[in-house]
Amino acid sequence: MVPPPSNPQQVQQFLSSALSQRGPSSVPYEESNKWLIRQHLLNLISSYPSLEPKTASFMHNDGRSVNLLQADGTIPMPFHGVTYNIPVIIWLLESYPRHPPCVYVNPTADMIIKRPHAHVTPSGLVSLPYLQNWVYPSSNLVDLVSDLSAAFARDPPLYSRRRPQPPPPSPPTVYDSSLSRPPSADQSLPRPFPPSPYGGGVSRVQVQHVHHQQQSDDAAEVFKRNAINKMVEMVHSDLVSMRRAREAEAEELLSLQAGLKRREDELNIGLKEMVEEKETLEQQLQIISMNTDILDSWVRENQGKTKNLVDLDVDNAFECGDTLSKQMLECTALDLAIEDAIYSLDKSFQDGVVPFDQYLRNVRLLSREQFFHRATGSKVRAAQMEVQVAAIAGRLHS
């Protein structure tokens, strides 16, 4: 259990540290709800300073143990004109604030839970209409504690346990002159709660030497308790130091693990890309090998024919399948030739070789001729499309 802070500034620092902590000892609340949880606890401590925020291990009914926030302390309970302090523990479960907290009455060793009670079970679990009708996000801890105080004022959940009174000794007794009457066992110490409804006899007298003996016993008990508290504080300080050191080591190891995991992912991605690239290159190599074999076969087949092509006219190197294809080839060749001529004229004009008026006249003539060749090519292309459509229709009908 983490010790509670002692002042408002430490309360804020404690809550900020607890809600932002990472690792095995972190609290399991949703990130979107942590700010509202912090505000609820700050408002609660501001309204009821007797409550203190802590973190502790909570055991569920199924055996699961989780580290949760709690508000531990006392809440005021007015009863018959006197204000009593009821010790409670308010656990903020994992689903808080969307679901209500878990409230327990936490009786001390000299207290007992009233049985039966309308709102408190024998184990100390509190059940109130406010908890059953919890509405997110309007419900909060301040209103819950106010409702608890009012419900307990109507029906106190705790009674003080009666202590056994030792029998008085047989020697003559001397009464304390400062008291108006011999004090009883119930009057020797103030009770913070209503008396127990259960029976039990009490002594009506108290001897003087017993009174002094109790004072010496109380002093020894106080010394013993202070020594135990000092040892507990020392052990707790050592445990806190060890826990912080272990948490720092755990955070460092978690950071190292995250870095290694990130590098592993990068290596896996790189390896996958290399495997895919290797497969692609193997496919391309196979295609290139097939094309190389085809070219080698073509070269071997046509190697003897090159001797007959020495006196071949370049214009007759390509034979067209029909008249339209031959006309289309001529139009395209003339169009491209004129395009080259215009480009040469532009180059010559930029270099200052051709005068401006001659440049414009030649470009105008060439452009007009190019237009006619392109128009003829468009008509030939349309005629080829008609022939192809007719051929396809003939094959379909046949």
Swiss-Prot record:
Its main location: other. It is found in: Early endosome; Late endosome; Prevacuolar compartment. One of its GO terms (molecular function) is ubiquitin binding. GO terms for cellular component: early endosome; ESCRT I complex; late endosome; protein-containing complex. GO terms for biological process: cell division; protein modification process; protein transport; trichome branching. Residues 322-390 form the SB domain. Residues 175-187 have a biased composition (Polar residues). Residues 18-162 form the UEV domain. It comes from the Eukaryota. Ubiquitinated by SINAT1, SINAT2, SINAT3 and SINAT4 for subsequent proteasomal degradation. Expressed in roots, stems, leaves and flowers. SUPFAM superfamilies: Endosomal sorting complex assembly domain, UBC-like. Residues 157-202 are annotated as: Disordered. Residues 247-291 form a coiled coil. Keywords: Coiled coil, Endosome, Protein transport, Transport, Ubl conjugation. Disruption phenotype: Clustered trichomes and multinucleated cells. Belongs to the ubiquitin-conjugating enzyme family. UEV subfamily. Component of the endosomal sorting required for transport complex I (ESCRT-I), composed of ELC, VPS28 and VPS37. Interacts with VPS28 and VPS37. Binds ubiquitin in vitro. Interacts with FREE1. Interacts with TOL9/TOM1D. Interacts with BRO1/ALIX. Interacts with SINAT1, SINAT2, SINAT3 and SINAT4. Component of the ESCRT-I complex (endosomal sorting complex required for transport I), a regulator of vesicular trafficking process. Required for the sorting of endocytic ubiquitinated cargos into multivesicular bodies (MVBs). May control nuclear division through the microtubule cytoskeleton. This is Protein ELC. It comes from Arabidopsis thaliana. The lineage of its organism: Eukaryota, Viridiplantae, Streptophyta, Embryophyta, Tracheophyta.
